[in-house]
């Protein structure tokens, strides 16, 4: 009986957790990479569109027209609340990193909103140069 109560309690918690996943707001959101936004807040824009149950498409960029530095994103994601399971392509180009060459990330990636943050941060933070950390954020 004790184990039945524990199992029932866990199942109830799991169901409640799944029900509390809020839909992602569709439309325009801000995107940043810290190298372009450092000392100024000039976010880029992404457009998010619902394509199915908890499924969305995303496309957009942040670009500095003076330096031609940028981050672009195009793909789809599954909404898991504070975690987005992204599948697609992210390209960043910062003149002082990776020899000024674009860094391309393809396939499955995770964005996560930790604590009270109001944005999802890309969890695969290592740039193609193998030593630089990029913070790519998509704001709620």
Task: Annotate each predicted stretch with a short phrase.
Residues 5-16:
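Hydrophobic h-region of N-terminal signal peptides that target proteins for export
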Residues 50-97:
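Mature extracytoplasmic domains of secretory-pathway proteins
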């Amino acid at each position: 009986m004790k184990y039945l109560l524990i199992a029932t309690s866990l199942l109830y918690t799991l169901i409640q957790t799944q029900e509390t996943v809020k839909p992602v707001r569709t439309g325009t959101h801000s995107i940043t990479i810290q190298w372009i936004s450092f000392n100024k807040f000039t976010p880029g824009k992404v457009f998010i569109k619902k394509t199915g149950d908890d499924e969305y498409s995303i496309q957009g960029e942040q670009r500095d027209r003076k330096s031609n530095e940028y981050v672009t994103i195009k793909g789809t994601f599954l909404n898991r609340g504070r975690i987005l399971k992204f599948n697609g392509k992210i390209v960043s180009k910062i003149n002082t990193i990776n020899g000024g060459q674009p860094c391309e990330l393809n396939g499955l990636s995770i964005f996560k909103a930790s604590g009270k943050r109001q944005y999802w941060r890309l969890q695969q933070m290592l740039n193609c140069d193998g030593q630089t950390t990029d913070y790519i954020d998509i704001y709620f």
